[in-house]
């Protein structure tokens, strides 16, 4: 199973993977249903989760029903239990919308929900994160998860996120991070997918963030 999923992840770009998931998801839910693992996003149980990972495959991490990973489920639980995110009416901007959240956010009547990405087939606005087509101070909340590590000019991208967020707004800007690394490592001369995967962890990543990521967010 791990070899199959690793091959699929390595062979198809993300927009195609999203389209393929529409076909595979109902079958996976049916054949893997059980009660060993519970997905807190939809409450469904499975005898096991699926493996996932572009390099080293992790066992039992991808939920068959929501296609959520650990970070998605943790974020869901945090937003539900520690914030008023789901309670207050808001205009929400969601970059590269995760399938785990997309349908659920879209159904919330007191959300004005806007999705954006350059390539995602489920994004409503095709836009460059470094040059967003939105007015300043437009959004109450912004979700931008595991996007910035793909962007060459992440400083400009973060500045754009701040520009379109309302004063006092909430932003969740998750990135993959090496907590043992003090300084972010990036080298824009590295363009070979295999070399990027080796150095940055994934073929389409352009850096590995260190603990200085938080200072970068503060300085932009």
Predicted regions and their residues:
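Conserved N-terminal segment of class I S-adenosyl-L-methionine
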Residues: 2-133
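S-adenosyl-L-methionine-dependent methyltransferase catalytic module, highlighting the catalytic core
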Residues: 3, 15-18, 24-37, 41, ...
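An acidic- and aromatic-residue-enriched active-site/binding cleft used to recognize and process polar
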Residues: 118, 144, 176-178
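Residues marking the start of alpha-helices
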Residues: 128-130, 147, 205
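A short SAM/SAH-binding and catalytic strip from SAM-dependent methyltransferases
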Residues: 140-152
């Amino acid at each position: 199973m791990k070899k199959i999923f690793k091959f699929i992840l390595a062979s198809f770009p993300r927009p195609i993977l999203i389209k393929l998931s529409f076909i595979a998801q109902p079958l996976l839910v049916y054949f893997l249903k059980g009660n060993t693992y519970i997905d807190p996003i939809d409450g469904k149980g499975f005898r096991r989760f699926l493996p996932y990972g572009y390099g080293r495959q992790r066992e039992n991490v991808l939920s068959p029903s929501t296609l959520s990973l650990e970070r998605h489920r943790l974020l869901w639980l945090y937003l539900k239990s520690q914030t008023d995110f789901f309670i207050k009416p808001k205009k929400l901007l969601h970059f590269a919308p995760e399938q785990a959240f997309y349908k659920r956010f879209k159904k919330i009547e007191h959300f004005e929900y806007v999705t954006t990405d350059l390539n995602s087939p489920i994004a409503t606005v095709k836009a460059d994160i470094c040059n967003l087509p939105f007015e300043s101070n437009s959004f109450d909340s912004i979700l931008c998860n595991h996007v910035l590590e793909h962007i060459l000019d992440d400083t400009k991208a973060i500045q754009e996120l701040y520009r379109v967020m309302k004063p006092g707004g909430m932003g969740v800007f998750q990135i993959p991070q090496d907590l043992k690394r003090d300084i972010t490592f990036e080298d824009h001369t590295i363009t070979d997918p295999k070399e990027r995967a080796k150095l940055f962890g994934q073929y389409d990543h352009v850096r590995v963030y260190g603990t200085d990521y938080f200072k970068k967010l503060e300085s932009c």
